[in-house]
Amino acid sequence: MKDNDDVKAVVLRVNSPGGSAFASEQIWHAVKELKTKKPVIVSMGDYAASGGYYISCVADTIVAEPTTLTGSIGIFGMIPNVKGLTDKIGLSYDVVKTNKYADFGNIMRPFNEDEKSLLQMMITEGYDTFVTRCAEGRHMTKEAIEKIAEGRVWTGETAKELGLVDELGGIDKALDIAVAKVGIEGYTVVSYPEKQDFLSSLLDTKPTNYVESQLLKSKLGEYYQQFGLLKNLQEQSMIQARIPFELNIK
């Protein structure tokens, strides 16, 4: 997209509570590189928090809905410890390693103090990088960002007052800004990834995964959503730039 001359501007739609801190940094670099060739306008959906804000802060313009949940500038580390469970069911294991950090992150035992210190160092460095990215992207000082960071979550309306967001509105507002920046008429909007038709989507569905998910849903009931969140966290890296709660509005 960066080198496609037919693409004059990019509207990046962000609707995410965040995720892997490493992935957020990689996407931040990609957006920054794209920005050197053409305007990048971020349009925020329901969420653009933590990692969602991380990848947004470098854009030329950020547009959020008044009710968007954004900010949450912070990261955390979470390593499950299943030793109590394995002891309960009588499961034991042995480890052979070359040095004391070789099995760092092993969920079969609790962290020792050295590992806790190492994880804390990784979190501290990651947080400093996050704050630095926000300061650079928003043309603010690190001190100013730190006053509104530390994981605080803001609505789009408040975020605009704090300087984290430029404009209030939806994706149409973001498109208008993109068009104005490049001064074109008679444009066509192309969405990525391209939507699949029903048949293609059905053929791409793995029957085994679908059956398993339906069985789990029937067994877990209202807890299925929480199970999905935990499963998602377990599959991602140990350092997360993610809003640390799940909203359920009824």
What are these regions, as identified by a protein language model?
Residues M1-L85:
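Cleft-lining beta-strand/loop regions that shape enzyme active-site pockets
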Residues K2, R13, K88, T188-P193, ...:
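C-terminal recognition in membrane/secretory proteostasis and scaffolding
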Residues V14-S16, M44-D46, A59, P66-T68, ...:
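Active-site proximal loops enriched in glycine and acidic residues that flank catalytic Cys/His/Asp
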Residues A21-Q26, T158-E161, L203-T205:
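Short glycine/threonine-rich loop-to-helix capping motif typified by GTGT followed
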Residues K83, D87-L168, D172-V182:
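Charged, glycine-interspersed solvent-exposed loop segments at helix/strand-loop junctions
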Residues M122, E194-K250:
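Intrinsic disorder and flexible/low-complexity segments
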Residues D172-T205:
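C-terminal intrinsically disordered, low-complexity extensions immediately downstream
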